[in-house]
Amino acid sequence: MNTDAQALHNSKADIKLHLGKSTTNGLGAGADPSVGEAAANESRDDIKEALAGADMVFVTIGAGGGTGSGAGYVVAEIARELGILVVGVATKPFSFEGEKRRKNAEWAINKLGRAVDTLITIPNDRLLQTIDRRTPLLETFKIADDVLRQGVQGISELITEHGLINLDFADVKAIMSNAGSALMGIGRASGDNRAVQAAQQAIESPLIEVSIDGAKGVLFNVTGGYDMLWQEHIMRR
């Protein structure tokens, strides 16, 4: 979904939805969330049609701009009205993107959090702790986008991919329905003790802004190669 016709044209998505054709005349929202909000409201019927029949919807936004910030919560509200489980994933802008985008992001994340079952917030500034300082700017934004992708993929594959310890939609719904704020950690390791190292990395991930103490539920996705041994299990610390 986008207000920008050119961005939609360049998108590789199978299904594309042009929001607010009259509101923006095919242009973007100009970093104004109120324009994105108006565009989504103009296209409510189209959004309903696109979401009809879904059991679970991810509403992903790069908070701070116009379209995602303004339209995200509207899409989430429509999905909830249709009885769909809705998971929001929002990236906070880097601090170097400026005060306006920071304020837009705060507004957008607050609105989205009220409209979804579960909201995962990814603080882009904390990503800077994990990447080389010499990383080019465009590559930095790509890394931020990829973390968002990993969040969505990690949850969706619990349902779509058959695992050795299988979970289904009912399991995911039990954890994520009306859950509120959620945290996401990612860990990778190889060699000796890799399972424990990866789990520890996920728990101590810089993406986690607050303590996980008091969490009421956990979704844990472990992926390994064909050489993973049965002894490699996640041990209690």
Indicate residue ranges for each PLM-predicted region.
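Tubulin/FtsZ superfamily GTPase core signature
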Residues: 1-237
